[in-house]
Swiss-Prot record:
Protein name (Swiss-Prot/TrEMBL): Phosphate acyltransferase
The protein's annotated pathway: Lipid metabolism; phospholipid metabolism
Gene Ontology biological process terms from the UniProt entry: fatty acid biosynthetic process; phospholipid biosynthetic process
NCBIfam families: plsX
Stated family: Belongs to the PlsX family.
Gene name linked to the record: plsX
Broad enzyme group: transferase
EC number: 2.3.1.274
One Pfam match: FA_synthesis
Function: Catalyzes the reversible formation of acyl-phosphate (acyl-PO(4)) from acyl-[acyl-carrier-protein] (acyl-ACP). This enzyme utilizes acyl-ACP as fatty acyl donor, but not acyl-CoA.
Subunit relationships: Homodimer. Probably interacts with PlsY.
Record InterPro entries: FA_synthesis, Phospholipid_synth_PlsX-like
Amino acid sequence: MVKLAIDMMGGDNAPDIVLEAVQKAVEDFKDLEIILFGDEKKYNLNHERIEFRHCSEKIEMEDEPVRAIKRKKDSSMVKMAEAVKSGEADGCVSAGNTGALMSAGLFIVGRIKGVARPALVVTLPTIDGKGFVFLDVGANADAKPEHLLQYAQLGDIYAQKIRGIDNPKISLLNIGTEPAKGNSLTKKSYELLNQDHSLNFVGNIEAKTLMDGDTDVVVTDGYTGNMVLKNLEGTAKSIGKMLKDTIMSSTKNKLAGAILKKDLAEFAKKMDYSEYGGSVLLGLEGTVVKAHGSSNAKAFYSAIRQAKIAGEQNIVQTMKETVGESNE
């Protein structure tokens, strides 16, 4: 049995989509228990495997992260993180304030001993539909080569345990594929990655080929990773809008759109990274999953499923025994 703590109040569409996702999750997974934290006035579920706990406070999207975690002690996010810290829950999921959730992860759940800096990881789509693991996408704006090596080690475990990939191929995001390309960070990181024979490091990868499906894990610093992630999100939205405008521009195009409706829907599903769940803060003493702030019920459900798999696979213990112990 896996037990997850859920922030009912976090996100643009909370609590409605959270309640819908939680209801579906406990119906689909008979080995899942939920502790739901939020406002009792908004709670309307009744299930034997859902425990509700009232919280008098909520962390808003505009709240300053560290201050909010320290001052709003009875917020749904803080109480959720405390449940993971105490061992009462195996992991947690929230669509709330990203900075506050990362602060809760660091200051409440706690960092694995030996992990220098936790990394935020997402799974992004590829043209072949299998996706790739991408980190760090914003936990740390600055990074040293040693941090990128550790990100690769964390990403390697994540790809194996969560995505079910044996001996995942690991690449370093760079401005060229040649080993000598890049700045001092990428050059030194390349050397360290190449020297770690426990990793299946296959070299540099350029941003233009990220979605080709040639690698399983891509490592970069949080500043670069966050910009790449937002660029991919923005490009996908722009292409979708352009395609819709083109289809609606004439009767001929509308007919073509109707004929291709099923294929276009399949394409949209393939490129929808919410299918893979939320982003995960790796390197902590518990599983912390960040669902997108604008998540619908489907995306939040995927994030719950992702946290459940992490609990089943005991990914935190694996990271302690490998990444943590090797860096003590």
